[in-house]
């Protein structure tokens, strides 16, 4: 039932004021044993996952980031009582002794948030936060970028990947959560009349890499101000 509730409503019941969320997270992390190993995010359905807490790491940097992602998830993910009932009906059909009786009592109580049972806590010692699955996957990269931002030195982070792999989503999150500017390669298309005849067979053959280098990478690497001139594909102008 807890899994059903979490996959339906996400971390809504754990969200609140950012300061409270952060204090609770820091307190929980500080109590974890140092040898508690990191685990990959655990998908729980409906676009959500459990991000497990580890016993080591720089939580003074990671905890605020995780708190922000939790609050973003709570604001963006919305479930309904009907969605929860669909999950409970599926659970009721499982051949588990006592499930039907337990769910009957749970429904009469109004289906409140569910806590892990003592037996589950003893067996698994759960410590995690529920995030959107994408946010759980992005977290290591976001944390690495946060470390660069904290260094106080100019830094350039390149995000590469296949079409539709989440590059823009990660970049947007960095822009929302970190003190940085995001430059999209979509703004640096090469005008069609300047492309090679076989540009489709050339990696980045449709990109104006020379302009991107001179207007963005060189000044950004030197800590200087960049001049962003997006290319408008419709008008063919900058």
Which residues fall in each region the model found?
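Long, basic/Gly/Ser/Thr-rich N-terminal segments
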Residues: 1-120
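P-loop (Walker A) phosphate-binding loop of NTP-binding proteins
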Residues: 162
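N-terminal pre-Walker A segment at the start of P-loop NTPase domains
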Residues: 124-150
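Conserved nucleotide-sensing/catalytic segment adjacent to the nucleotide-binding pocket
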Residues: 181-238
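Conserved lysine of the Walker
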Residues: 167
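Short hydrophobic/aromatic beta-strand immediately N-terminal to the Walker A/P-loop
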Residues: 156-158
């Amino acid at each position: 039932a807890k899994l059903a509730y979490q996959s339906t409503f996400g971390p809504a019941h754990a969200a609140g004021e950012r300061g409270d969320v952060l204090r609770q997270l820091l307190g929980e992390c500080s109590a974890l044993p140092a040898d508690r190993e990191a685990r990959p995010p655990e998908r729980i359905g409906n676009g959500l996952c459990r991000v497990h807490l580890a016993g080591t790491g720089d939580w003074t940097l990671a905890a605020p980031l995780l708190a922000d992602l939790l609050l973003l998830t709570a604001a963006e993910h919305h479930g309904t009582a009907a969605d929860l009932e669909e999950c409970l009906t599926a659970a009721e059909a499982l051949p588990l002794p006592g499930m039907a009786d337990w769910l009957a009592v749970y429904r009469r109580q109004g289906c409140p948030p569910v806590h892990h049972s003592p037996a589950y806590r003893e067996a698994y010692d759960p410590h995690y936060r529920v995030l959107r699955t994408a946010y759980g996957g992005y977290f290591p990269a976001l944390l690495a970028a946060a470390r660069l931002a904290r260094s106080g030195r100019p830094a350039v982070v390149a995000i590469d990947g296949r079409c539709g792999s989440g590059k823009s989503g990660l970049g947007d999150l960095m822009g929302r959560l970190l003190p940085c500017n995001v430059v999209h390669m979509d703004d640096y298309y090469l005008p069609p009349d300047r492309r090679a005849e076989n540009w489709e067979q050339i990696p980045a053959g449709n990109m104006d890499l020379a302009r991107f280098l001179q207007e963005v990478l060189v000044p950004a690497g030197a800590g200087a101000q960049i001049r962003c001139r997006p290319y408008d594909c419709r008008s063919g102008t900058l």
